[in-house]
């Protein structure tokens, strides 16, 4: 039997089991754990499209119709990177969802075929490419609609949060308050190739105004200190969430006016909620909001400006905070409020808590102390910095960083999906899930994706001059594709709503075009359900020195002086 070398094989069909590759210009290396395309029994039955290649009539392309099982699209020889594994496989898409992960081809001429390529099957060649689930950003201030395109080009395909545009309340808080505003935002969602879900305002001491927002379709409620996150408001909001199977997100009381972190924890009575910017620079009880990392009912996340900790982090935060929270630098009390939230000791500890799997999620805090297009970049920069400073994680080897890669990718894919009750639809590369997939060249991984699919159809891509004779000539930049136009928008993306809203027929009442999907199974979620990120240590924060300990271990690290995934990728 004729053979070829591993390098030649990888260049032709992409890496196979045992091959390794570097993620962008980081120190992170992943190794292919398995090759599902070998279900044919051995090498030699790979499928590939092109002149003189195998996906031709009577070869790897069968005569089967769609009704007989042929896929709508097959992504060939992809390197899937997800929380469950790092594997080589073909990916079959059908009806906007992931249908099969395995071996594609023609069952009439090839053994071990899991998915059928037919005359009606499109091919996306992924040889040498990484495929991930679309990212989920669960802390969005919907300040301007242009955020959505920015996020999509970064590899984010689901945005959850609140707001009504550049209103003062939205600058500071992720709330879409009241049924009228909620209706308008749900109607606006139809225009974008992005899965969207909205949070109502949760700050109220009586339930009626909260129920009317959930009945209007919000997926949860946001408690924000700028609206008064008192123990009474916390308890009432969680009462309503428990009754409606919706989530609560909390930005707690930085000034400790209505109570301390102990009072907030007590007010939850063990009921589940999401703790945004758990370190506290983005807001929350000063200086010890990090204590909630050790609570099973708090699902902790970080917003990206503090991640990772660098020599520039502290300097940019005071001005950022003054603008976002409508503060006046000429008022001493406002300046003191801002400075109380910026603590190098807790920011340094935040990096390590992510590496330990104690903080479970990443998000942006878009335009409100966060950068909407940098969730994925900063996740992997943090992973790189922690490998440099802390070395290998248990479970990794001298050959690879697979466990660290799975831990960090889970922070912006499966874990926010679980936390917000949408993991039945999105958050991973698994059969049955909505086909929101991102294709990356390894050298550009986490920075600039090549192709972004929404519901199995290409919605955004790095594309060259439309007047050129081929697709690749400069200027190459992100351009909306056909999945981002016309009726394809509504067919390719979901709007997440409450079950109460679905029951109230908001689709018809509000005249919504997108498919509505109800959030579910939220109230039983605990920290232990955060994949690869379920560590709940006993947290201690010294009120005088701000030093942080987890299970007695002092958490401190140096700020990074330089980072990968930065200037060399953004010359233009």
From Swiss-Prot:
Record EC number: 3.5.1.5
The keyword Metal-binding belongs to this UniProt entry's keyword annotation: yes
Cofactor binding description: Binds 2 nickel ions per subunit.
GO MF term list: nickel cation binding; urease activity
Name of the molecule in the record: Urease subunit alpha
Similarity comment: family membership: Belongs to the metallo-dependent hydrolases superfamily. Urease alpha subunit family.
Post-translational modification: Carboxylation allows a single lysine to coordinate two nickel ions.
Any one GO cellular component localisation term in the record: cytoplasm
Protein species of origin: Polaromonas sp. (strain JS666 / ATCC BAA-500)
Record key words, sorted: Cytoplasm, Hydrolase, Metal-binding, Nickel
GO biological process, one term: urea catabolic process
Subcellular location: Cytoplasm
Binding positions (Ni(2+) 2): 222, 251, 277
Residues bound to Ni(2+) 1: 139, 141, 222, 365
Record-listed substrate binding positions: 224
InterPro entries from the UniProt entry: Amidohydro-rel, Metal-dep_hydrolase_composite, Metal_Hydrolase, Urease_alpha_N_dom, Urease_alpha_subunit, Urease_AS, Urease_asu, Urease_asu_c
Pathway: Nitrogen metabolism; urea degradation; CO(2) and NH(3) from urea (urease route): step 1/1
SUPFAM superfamilies: Composite domain of metallo-dependent hydrolases, Metallo-dependent hydrolases
Description of how the protein assembles with itself and partners: Heterotrimer of UreA (gamma), UreB (beta) and UreC (alpha) subunits. Three heterotrimers associate to form the active enzyme.
Catalytic site positions: 325 (proton donor)
One Pfam assignment: Urease_alpha
